[in-house]
Amino acid sequence: MYVIDPIADMLTRIRNANNARHEVVDIPASKMKKAIAQILLEEGFIKEYEIIDDGKNGIIRIKLKYGPNKERAITGLKRISKPGRRVYAGKDELPKVLGGLGIAIISTSKGIMTDKKARKEGVGGEVLCYIW
């Protein structure tokens, strides 16, 4: 299956699995999706992820994180920069999501990172998505 916007597809799969309170979600793998999954892990939005070899690019299996009463760790995900309308932010214009409670994932010349790390590194880039 050909997907026009693979990152939006990844976010939608996570959102749907999260809303249905599934434990795991499988996503076709790519380097960018692996980097996003790593950021989600580091920021505490998911339990863990693993790469499963399927003979092609592989599959990322993400284990979603919930609280003791099935409260979601991820409240919302929003794609910002889309194939039809790219959104860029300079180092001084990097967004703060919900006043710092959420994260923005930025694709910079130094790799994919959170808005907080991009501010620290002093780089701007393409604003991929918001997660809170």
From Swiss-Prot:
This is Small ribosomal subunit protein uS8. GO terms for biological process: translation. The lineage of its organism: Bacteria, Bacillati, Bacillota, Bacillota incertae sedis, Caldicellulosiruptorales. One of its GO terms (cellular component) is ribonucleoprotein complex. HAMAP family: Ribosomal_uS8_B. It comes from the Bacteria. SUPFAM superfamilies: Ribosomal protein S8. One of the primary rRNA binding proteins, it binds directly to 16S rRNA central domain where it helps coordinate assembly of the platform of the 30S subunit. Belongs to the universal ribosomal protein uS8 family. Keywords: Ribonucleoprotein, Ribosomal protein, RNA-binding, rRNA-binding. Disulfide bonds: none annotated. Part of the 30S ribosomal subunit. Contacts proteins S5 and S12. GO terms for molecular function: rRNA binding; structural constituent of ribosome.
